[in-house]
């Protein structure tokens, strides 16, 4: 399936970085203090969420203070020697790590080594100026991240969720083709499954970002319901992808299906693919009949193994029973997805009728 992708050349975070740098320079020029350290701090302080900007800003300030202190100390005793740079960098990194100021280590180290060549005397004054410039960069960037284009990830998460439905269905289709042919799945299918897992991880990360900033911004009830819907959908899709991953790892070339069993399995998986492509909004009666047939097959295979008494070690589940179990598990997730969608639609209709 060909999908039209929209590429944003300049995203919100890039725009906010530019605004933060611009405002930081204006503030520094107004107070007649050096701009370079403030600008560096402003750039790295822009985070995906306002919460992270505040938390990491509180870490970067003391870290930069440590870097500045080491820079001035070693410059005072050793001058502008190579050893001054090395010791300032090393001591800054070690101290930040020991004090668990991990988010500020990079900025602090850059500050330390950059201060040495531009400071010839008045070391304490230079130290205080550096604190002022660092504070300016942190404060300006945090305010910009909080008030200008505040991050909202609900639409992005919804887009990722829809893409996951489509790609998951496509992988199921590829796996079905391999099953029908009795061959191992292709490297392309394995690669596609890896990409789906990466997309899922990305979507879950966006959910975490949205949750972090949830308390700082107002949301309508509709936005809150929409967010909770996609959050639950992602959780269930994560389980579906887990079951598909198990299917991909199950040896299908050793399966010994009857023609009728293979046909029922084929029709069931085709039905699952259609449901996924429809975002689990509808499951017809024919699908439930196929699931009942598949359920009977599963217990038949399990009972056959239970009565089997081999002389040597054997697996408690055959490849056939594993495949049937995973497909039935995927169906359970589809039912939950459908119930969630129906509940969401019902709440929307109720609220529309009230208003």
Curated annotation (Swiss-Prot):
Its main location: membrane. It comes from Bacillus cereus (strain ATCC 10987 / NRS 248). It is a multi-pass membrane protein. This is UPF0421 protein BCE_2776. It is found in: Cell membrane. One of its GO terms (cellular component) is plasma membrane. It holds the Pfam family ArAE_1. Belongs to the UPF0421 family. InterPro entries: ArAE_1. The chain crosses the membrane at residues 19-39, 74-94, 109-129, 131-151. Keywords: Cell membrane, Membrane, Transmembrane, Transmembrane helix.
